Amino acid sequence: MKTKCLVTAVAVLVSIAIMGAFGPAVQAKQCDRQCLVNMMQRYLAAMVKHNPQAVPFADNVKFTENGEKIMESLPVGKGLWETVSGGPTAFQIYAADPVAQAVACLVIMKEKDKDILLGARLKLVDGKIAEVEHLVSRGNVDGSRPTLQKPRPGLLEDVPPAERMDRGELIKIGLSYYDALTGEDGTYAPFARECERHENGAVSVGGTRQAPKPKPEAKPDPEAELRMKAMAAMPNTCEGQISTGTFAYITDISPRRLVVADTQKGLAVGFSMFQHDGSLKVMPIKGVPGIDSMPAPQLRFNWPSMHIFKIRKGKIYEIEALGAYLPYGAKPGW
């Protein structure tokens, strides 16, 4: 009997020792919000130093980045890892999702000493980076813009604990933005009256809109000038602009993925592929006095995009978007 009790006691002690040895290690593999943000910052720092060994990658890590013609699947250490020359600057937005073990950022970096916008996503499995997604905007990024000096405060502020929404609500609201665009109806998404959208650093609705500047050598384009005139007359609200039908030239948005929901910051982050087949010639315009139609862009292209939505009290207040050109039909890689 004594021998049996002794064996039982030893077994219990061994079990406790095993739990002590492995329990904390298992827990340590799950990152909280700050841990995820730290991992992204470590990742960016390692990239600037061209040193992939400085961060932990899973053996089967998947890494994609947009090239000139396709969304490329690359070995870690290639792509922007080879060409980045500095950053990030003061313009840094982070969103982290402990439930999904995912983190995203939108930052200004330098590539060969020129400004670029980088939207990046990491997904961790057992504490190691298993997925990396880069979306890089090159050539049309002006880091001297006031809108790219630092993020809007709302994108950085915590939501008061009593007002925080759960992940499912943030994801649903973020996805509704794409429904509003393809449905040509701004009421499909819960936009705040003060909603302001920035695209590649330019204010596209809300605030003081900034029209893209034509290149000095560009030839006059009457249709483009007509579109710009019509855009200037559009309602300057997120809901109103969409409801006019000015985005009818978007053939589809597919896929659309809400990859990060940050309940502390009230941020939802989506990666998507805007598709434009160029078949629409004229877009009917609704609700704009003096304008009932406008020419549709006659271009076939895809526009891989990242959108960060700031959501408070169930409404979208800020949108920070990044997009880049790819040929029509390009696949997203995910």
What residue spans do the PLM features occupy?
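Positively charged n-region of N-terminal signal peptides that target proteins for export
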Residues: M1-K4
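Bacterial N-terminal signal peptides
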Residues: A9-A21
